[in-house]
Amino acid sequence: MSPRHLFLLALLPALAATAAETPERQRPVGAAQAVNITHTLRQIPEACARLEGTFTGDAAQPYRFVVARTSEQCQPRAKFVDFDKAQPSEAKGWKLNDVIRVPSAACPTQQAVVRVWRLPVEQKLQLDGQGQSRIYLEEAKKQAAAGQIAEIPMYAAKMTVEGKACP
């Protein structure tokens, strides 16, 4: 093999890692956030979820991340699951949906990074004569009793803190 081919072979793992890290949604780095101010990272309306974070100023746990329900009346069409239980990966059919980066205003060398994964589901909706998708309560109850509940998409998120901590 020529040196050129060896060089290209050496680059393959780096290219594969970059391709695996490319999320479905592209976004710039967020605005720097102050310590002890809770901010919304992203809303996922179909899961009735809002991702929130707070820089704490604590070296042991510099960032607090929570998934909050948007409203008690919201009817989710997707499910938000625990990342550690789901262990999402492309091999399991999950897609890296979003990477959210938020720098700390108090420590510019540090940023919170939230990776949001999505497990898509093929949902074929049957349309009626008016072109509308309708759910009839009695039919839905019968299907649920028979264990024929349709799958719904799932989301999972993992937060890490990257960069160097400030003194």
Question: Which residues make up each language-model segment?
Answer:
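Bacterial N-terminal signal peptides that target proteins for export
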Residues: 1-8
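Hydrophobic h-region of N-terminal signal peptides that target proteins for export
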Residues: 10-19
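Ser/Thr-rich low-complexity repeats and stalk/linker segments
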Residues: 21-167
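A ubiquitous, low-specificity "background" feature that marks scattered single residues
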Residues: 8-11, 46
